[in-house]
Amino acid sequence: MKISFFVLITFFSFFGYSQQHKYFSDYKDLAQQMEEKYSIPSCVILAVGYLESGGGTSKVGRLLHNHFGIVGPSKPAISGYKSSYKYFPTVDDSFIGFCELISSKKYYEKLKGSKDTSKWVNSIASGGYAADAKLWSKTVNAIIKKHCSN
């Protein structure tokens, strides 16, 4: 029985890591394009997208192409899903929408071009993006540490 439990824990740990790794590899190029255009670190973009969409597997992520939990019209006639979250025609549009939202905030000009991911995450969280800013920041920073540290 102990061996079975160990095997299950190992499997689920690997699956979780594998899913995170897949999300980061699938959207790395898109996030880098967004970094070039908006000067927001690509790893911040990826970590927020991963957290808010469950690695792209959440209902909102799949049906509304919304990887960032952005609130707005869900367009149920198009998406087939009524929600308080915004519908995007493509995942790419969701990434653009996130970067445009962040670039409209007061802290953006001060951080634009900075590679300090902690400052970005803390500013986004304290700027009203997350209901529980402290927990959200801690989680996003942990995702960044796991996937973006060299």
What are these regions (language model features)?
Residues 16-150:
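Catalytic cores of secreted/periplasmic lytic hydrolases that degrade extracellular macromolecules
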Residues 1-21:
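Bacterial Sec-dependent N-terminal signal peptides
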